[in-house]
Amino acid sequence: MRKMMSTMALTLGAAVFLAFAAATAQAQRCGEQGSNMECPNNLCCSQYGYCGMGGDYCGKGCQNGACWTSKRCGSQAGGATCPNNHCCSQYGHCGFGAEYCGAGCQGGPCRADIKCGSQSGGKLCPNNLCCSQWGFCGLGSEFCGGGCQSGACSTDKPCGKDAGGRVCTNNYCCSKWGSCGIGPGYCGAGCQSGGCDAVFAGAITANSTLLAE
């Protein structure tokens, strides 16, 4: 009996630790706002100190990780490739959008390389990349935002309690209305999961309640 109680205690302790770790990962702070910590898996640290992917994290103000504007690549960098399948522009910089993935693109999901969607007979993108409204594969708001046809689209995915507890891809926020996206309307008050501004406290409370039951 004593051995069984000991095993149960160890199991409960492990569950509490894993719940704590999961909650911490969801609300990962980084950069100046997070004791200069770097994000896991080379995720971008936004100017506000949160980890994630997409323009709000990897664009202007990005502090570390796979920032779009800080990585050199291509012939200007000894043939180096961009992280996270970003495009390498003709000038040797990593990023997304026409200036990176368009004319002269040296590597990554260049527009001339990977086509998809209704423009290509319904073809899907590899690795769950987003298929933009124009029929090209990639990541970021230009591909995963309005008009996204397939893949990890950010704005048309149901999530949260009304979608069976589903979470958003790429650490996008699940708004209080149950849709995936980035910005105050998604990550602010009522945010259910993802990179929410205040997800840590809510996640700990929810996990503690679950364990207590």
UniProtKB/Swiss-Prot annotation:
Give every Chitin-binding type-1 domain span: 28-69, 70-112, 113-155, 156-198
Q: Work out whether the entry's keyword set contains Signal.
A: yes
Give the matching Pfam families: Chitin_bind_1
Classification via SMART domains: ChtBD1
Does the record's keyword annotation contain Cytoplasm?
no
Name the positions where substrate binds.
37-39, 89-100, 141-142
Where does the signal peptide begin and end? 1-27
Propeptide per record: which residue ranges?
Answer: 199-213
Question: Which key words tag this protein in UniProt?
Answer: Chitin-binding, Disulfide bond, Lectin, Pyrrolidone carboxylic acid, Repeat, Signal
Single Gene Ontology MF annotation = chitin binding
Write down which residues bear the modification named Pyrrolidone carboxylic acid.
Q28
Q: Which domain of life is it from?
A: Eukaryota
Coiled coil ranges: none
Disulphide bonds annotated for this chain are C30-C45, C39-C51, C44-C58, C62-C67, C73-C88, C82-C94, C87-C101, C105-C110, C116-C131, C125-C137, C130-C144, C148-C153, C159-C174, C168-C180, C173-C187, C191-C196
Q: Read off the Gene3D superfamilies from this record.
A: Endochitinase-like (3.30.60.10)
Its quaternary organisation is:
Homodimer, u-shaped.
Other remarks in the entry: The 4 sites proposed for binding to carbohydrates (N-acetyl-D-glucosamine) of receptor molecules are on the surface of the agglutinin molecule.
**What is the recorded function of this protein according to its Swiss-Prot or TrEMBL entry?**
N-acetyl-D-glucosamine / N-acetyl-D-neuraminic acid binding lectin.
PANTHER family attached to this UniProt entry: CHITIN-BINDING LECTIN 1, CHITIN-BINDING TYPE-1 DOMAIN-CONTAINING PROTEIN
The protein, known as: Agglutinin isolectin 2
What is the scientific name of the source organism? Triticum aestivum (Wheat)
Taxonomic lineage of the native organism: Eukaryota, Viridiplantae, Streptophyta, Embryophyta, Tracheophyta
